[in-house]
């Protein structure tokens, strides 16, 4: 055992002998960050995200969509939901990343294309929004109209 390893062990034993870190209740487990509920599936988390989004609780929605993509990284709809929740919070760069991942997984995903284009408009990137509109038009005329209107308002 190296000298460094022995020092770490001695330091750890010293902390334990003193009752643990200052103020810590060593009879209770340390708190952990919120995580996916036991037995929860990606679909469960996606649906949780949709409910939070419908309630306009975008922070909770983003957390649920993050759990969904952690459970199933290829879940394009969850990446899109994450992008939407982030965009609603004004987190545009993160939102773009989520939309790009959704579109990497499902290149002809009309909803993700519309929302990506709307995010570009929010960022003032109208040329990128127009290129996105060009991709969207043959896929979904209604969504293309909505994006076109957003671009026109963004001028």
Kindly give the residue locations of the regions a language model identified:
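Position-specific recognition of the canonical hydrophobic site in helix A of tetratricopeptide repeat
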Residues: 53, 80, 84-87, 104, ...
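Canonical tetratricopeptide repeat
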Residues: 81, 115, 149-150
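Helix-start (N-cap) detector for alpha-helical repeat units in TPR-like alpha-solenoids
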Residues: 42-43, 76-77, 110-111, 144-145
């Amino acid at each position: 055992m190296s000298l460094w390893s022995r020092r770490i062990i001695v330091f750890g034993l010293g902390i334990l002998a003193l009752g643990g870190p200052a103020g810590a209740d060593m009879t209770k487990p340390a708190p952990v960050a919120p995580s996916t509920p036991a037995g929860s599936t990606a679909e469960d988390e996606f649906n949780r995200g949709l409910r939070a989004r419908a309630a306009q609780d975008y922070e909770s929605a983003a957390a649920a969509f993050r759990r969904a993509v952690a459970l199933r990284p290829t879940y394009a709809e969850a990446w899109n939901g994450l992008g939407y929740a982030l965009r609603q919070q004004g987190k545009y760069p993160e939102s773009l990343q989520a939309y790009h991942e959704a579109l990497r997984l499902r290149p002809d995903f009309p909803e993700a294309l519309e929302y990506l284009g709307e995010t570009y408009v929010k960022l003032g990137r109208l040329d990128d929004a127009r290129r996105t509109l060009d991709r969207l038009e043959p896929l979904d005329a209604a969504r293309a109209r909505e994006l076109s209107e957003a671009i026109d308002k963004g001028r």
